[in-house]
């Protein structure tokens, strides 16, 4: 059971980092293109 908890926690952290990176990248592209 412990392994499942760590796996879920790891996946959630990775997905969160990926989401933040994508959002930041999109903002940079849109702002850079606008300027």
UniProtKB/Swiss-Prot annotation:
SUPFAM superfamilies: PetM subunit of the cytochrome b6f complex (SSF103441). InterPro entries: PetM_cyt_b6/f_cplx_su7. It comes from the Bacteria. Pfam families: PetM (PF08041). One of its GO terms (molecular function) is electron transfer activity. Keywords: Electron transport, Membrane, Photosynthesis, Thylakoid, Transmembrane, Transmembrane helix, Transport. It is found in: Cellular thylakoid membrane. It is a single-pass membrane protein. Component of the cytochrome b6-f complex, which mediates electron transfer between photosystem II (PSII) and photosystem I (PSI), cyclic electron flow around PSI, and state transitions. The 4 large subunits of the cytochrome b6-f complex are cytochrome b6, subunit IV (17 kDa polypeptide, PetD), cytochrome f and the Rieske protein, while the 4 small subunits are PetG, PetL, PetM and PetN. The complex functions as a dimer. This is Cytochrome b6-f complex subunit 7. It comes from Synechococcus sp. (strain JA-3-3Ab) (Cyanobacteria bacterium Yellowstone A-Prime). The lineage of its organism: Bacteria, Bacillati, Cyanobacteriota, Cyanophyceae, Synechococcales.
């Amino acid at each position: 059971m412990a392994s499942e908890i760590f796996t879920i926690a790891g996946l959630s952290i990775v997905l969160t980092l990926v989401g933040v990176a994508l959002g930041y990248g999109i903002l940079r592209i849109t702002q850079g293109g606008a300027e």
